[in-house]
């Protein structure tokens, strides 16, 4: 039995896969197995998998003839894994030098349920850069599980990526911590369940993983009904089920509820786009899971969603909620129809706000965003600019600008509000849209 199983779902990554696999083969630690799950690739990825499996006895390949999304591929990999610990690697990323030694040393020192890892970011040209969070090493060394869960929940928007964690395989199997199949935001479901079930944690203090954001071509690069809205609702429901079944209390309940609120907020940003057939499917999902929706009453904002479906039923309630989201968004610019409207920043929330306003007949000039990488990009037909462009506008034209700050994070709202004020934007020149 190897110490470590590396499970890698593979789908159309012929330009990245060899670097990923070579970063494993170059490790100085060798007590591992690699399980490649070729998820019905249509490029040369399957052949690359076969070549490595033929040359190296600790690399295995499983070919799927129907794509089952990353969740299905990971579950198949987990079923075939033999290692004491499991790591799920993305096939377009790779490992840092000596990272397996960091992992093995951590395992042999403490044998935790879950190991939390750090990463470095190497984006492709034109892709966005992401910074790692600053973990408090002392909290992990004190081994107070509740304190660790609370600490991780403080970074909840940043840590919901499967590759951050190495988990004890028997712990995963015993607690039935698998991936929600048929949906695309499986990380958002798996990570909270993992964190809220684990009793022991350890932290690898050195970055062990290299995350490579891609400019385009990833499975989640396009926001659609199938890969976002439907998945967000299903994932939120799955977490509510987990909350009820495990009877989570204290910080664990608070953490799960915060992720549900986040997911329902994302769901709200696209509900204006739903067509009739999608509304019917979503209503059926809601109808089948109404028993879990009582929890939503405890969360502000998502309570509105619950109120509509509880009072009017899943189908009419969802339709009324969609109308409510549109009207609440339009309300933010009421009386400023004649001004140049900008949305600040980009992202699910900002892009949803811009789309709703455009579809309701408002002229949106563009986005403001603090990302240098996004500066000059075109998103949904709108140009992205740094907020500093406001410095170059004379007072008369500046007074004719109206900005909607659109995000889910209240602490970010205050930062952006103060930034706009420093650029001579007055209080009556911006509104805040939180989903």
Regions found by a protein language model. Name each.
Residues 2-5, 23, 33, 189:
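Cell-envelope/extracellular polymer assembly enzymes that use nucleotide-activated donors
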Residues 12-26:
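Short, well-formed alpha-helical segments that are part of the catalytic scaffolds
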Residues 23, 30, 38-47, 66, ...:
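A conserved acidic beta->alpha catalytic loop
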Residues 64-81, 88:
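Glycine-rich, basic loop-to-helix element that forms the pyrophosphate-binding segment
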Residues 67, 71-73, 91-205, 209-227:
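Donor-binding/catalytic cores of nucleotide-activated saccharide
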Residues 206-215, 221-250, 269, 273-293, ...:
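Catalytic core of nucleotide-sugar-dependent glycosyltransferases
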Residues 273-342, 352-360:
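Membrane-interface aromatic/basic loop that binds lipid-linked glycans or pyrophosphate carriers
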Residues 372-435:
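Phosphate-bearing ligand-interacting subdomains
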């Amino acid at each position: 039995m190897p110490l470590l199983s590396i499970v890698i779902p593979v789908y159309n990554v012929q330009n990245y896969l060899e670097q990923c696999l070579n970063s494993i083969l170059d490790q100085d630690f060798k007590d591992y197995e690699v399980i490649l799950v070729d998820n019905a690739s249509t490029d040369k990825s399957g052949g690359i998998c076969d070549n490595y499996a033929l040359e190296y006895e600790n690399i295995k390949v499983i070919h799927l003839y129907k794509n089952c999304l990353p969740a299905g591929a990971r579950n198949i990999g987990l079923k075939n894994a033999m290692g004491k610990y499991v790591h799920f690697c993305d096939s377009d990323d790779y490992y840092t030098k000596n990272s397996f030694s960091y992992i093995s040393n951590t395992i042999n020192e403490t044998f935790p349920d879950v190991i939390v890892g750090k990463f470095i970011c190497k984006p492709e040209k034109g892709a966005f850069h992401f910074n790692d969070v600053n973990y408090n090493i002392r909290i992990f060394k004190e081994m107070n599980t509740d304190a660790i869960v609370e600490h991780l929940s403080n970074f909840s928007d940043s840590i919901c990526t499967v590759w951050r964690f190495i988990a004890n395989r028997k712990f995963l199997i015993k607690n039935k911590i698998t991936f929600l199949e048929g949906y695309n935001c499986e990380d958002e479901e798996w990570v909270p369940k993992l964190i809220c079930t684990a009793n022991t944690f350890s932290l690898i203090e050195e970055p062990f993983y290299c995350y490579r954001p891609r400019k385009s071509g990833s499975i989640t690069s396009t926001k659609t009904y199938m890969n976002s809205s439907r998945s967000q609702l299903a994932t939120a429901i799955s977490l509510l089920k987990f909350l009820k079944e495990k009877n989570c209390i204290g910080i664990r309940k608070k953490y799960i509820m915060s992720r549900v609120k986040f997911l329902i907020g994302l769901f709200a940003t696209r509900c204006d786009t739903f067509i009739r057939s999608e509304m019917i499917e979503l209503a059926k999902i809601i109808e089948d899971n109404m028993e879990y929706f009582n929890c939503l009453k405890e969360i502000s904002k998502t309570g509105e969603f619950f109120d509509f479906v509880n009072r009017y039923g899943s189908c009419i309630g969802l339709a009324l909620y969609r109308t409510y989201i549109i009207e609440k968004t339009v309300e933010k610019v009421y009386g400023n129809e004649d001004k140049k409207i900008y949305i600040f920043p980009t992202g699910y929330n900002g892009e949803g706000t811009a789309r709703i306003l455009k579809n309701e007949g408002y002229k949106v000039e563009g986005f403001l965003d603090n990302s240098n990488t996004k500066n000059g990009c075109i998103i949904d037909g709108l140009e992205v600019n740094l907020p500093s462009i406001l410095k170059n506008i004379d007072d008369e034209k500046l007074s004719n600008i109206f900005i909607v700050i659109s995000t889910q994070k209240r602490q970010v709202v205050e930062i952006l509000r103060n930034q706009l004020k420093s650029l001579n934007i007055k209080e009556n020149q911006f509104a805040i849209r939180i989903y």
